[in-house]
Amino acid sequence: MKKNIGVVGCGIVGLLVSYKFSQLGHKVTIFEKDNGLNFSNCSATAAGMISPYCELIHSDKKIFELGETSLLKWKKIIKELNSRIFFKSKGSLVVTQIAEKSDLELICERVNSHTKSKLKILTNKQIQKLEPDIDSINLAGLFFKDEGQVDCLEIMNALIKFLKLNGSIIKFESHVEGIKKNTVSLKGGERINFDHVIECAGLDS
C-alpha cells in the first residue's frame, strides 16, 4: 500500500531514506531548514571516506561490517542514479614515522585478527611506489586496498534530482518546530499529517 512519508532533514541520511521510500513507490515530502543552495549540514562538508578497515582501528567488528557493506551499496546506488558522481575504491594509505612503527604493528595485528586480511607494514620504497609525491624516506605505512571515497555534494545533488524527477517534494527553508503522532509542525503554525515521519535532522537541528 502506498504511504505518505514525511522526512525531516535533507542531509545524506534524509536523502537516502527518501530515496529508498521513493523506490518502493511511496509519496515522500522532505523538510529542510536551509535554502538548498548553501547547505550548512555536516553532509556537505564531510570527506566522504568509506574506510571500514581504518574504522576498525578504534571501533568494533560491527562497524567494519557495516562499512564493508556500504562500499557495495554505494556502487549500486550510484549506478541506479546514472549521474556523474565522483566515487573511487582504490584504497587508503596510512603512513607514520619509522619511530612509530610499533603503532602500525598493533594496527596490523588488530585488523588481521578481525578480518581475512593479511596486512603487512610497507617499506618506504613501497610507499613511494603507491604515492610518488610523498617523501617516504623515514616513513612506514599500511595500505587498505579496498577502501574508497565518494563526493558527498555530488551524491546529494544526484539524489535531490532523482527525488524531484520521481515526484517527491522537497520543502527548503522549512523550519520544523515539532513532530508528534506523525504530524509535522512548521514555524508559522502549519501542521502536516503523514502516515509515517522519519526524523533525519542532524545535531542541534
Model-derived segments and spans:
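Glycine-rich FAD pyrophosphate-binding loop
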Residues: 23-44
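Helical element adjacent to the flavin cofactor pocket in flavoenzyme catalytic cores
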Residues: 142-182, 186, 191-196, 200, ...
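N-terminal Rossmann-like FAD-binding beta1-loop-alpha1 element of flavoenzymes
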Residues: 3-29
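Short loop/edge segments at beta-strand edges and connector loops
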Residues: 32, 123-124, 170-174
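Short beta-strand/turn micro-motifs composed of small residues
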Residues: 9, 32, 96
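Short beta-to-alpha linker loops that shape the active-site pocket of alpha/beta-hydrolase fold enzymes
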Residues: 34-36, 127, 159
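Conserved Rossmann-like nucleotide-cofactor binding loop
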Residues: 13, 36, 204
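Dinucleotide-binding Rossmann-like beta1-alpha1 core, especially the glycine-rich loop
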Residues: 47-130
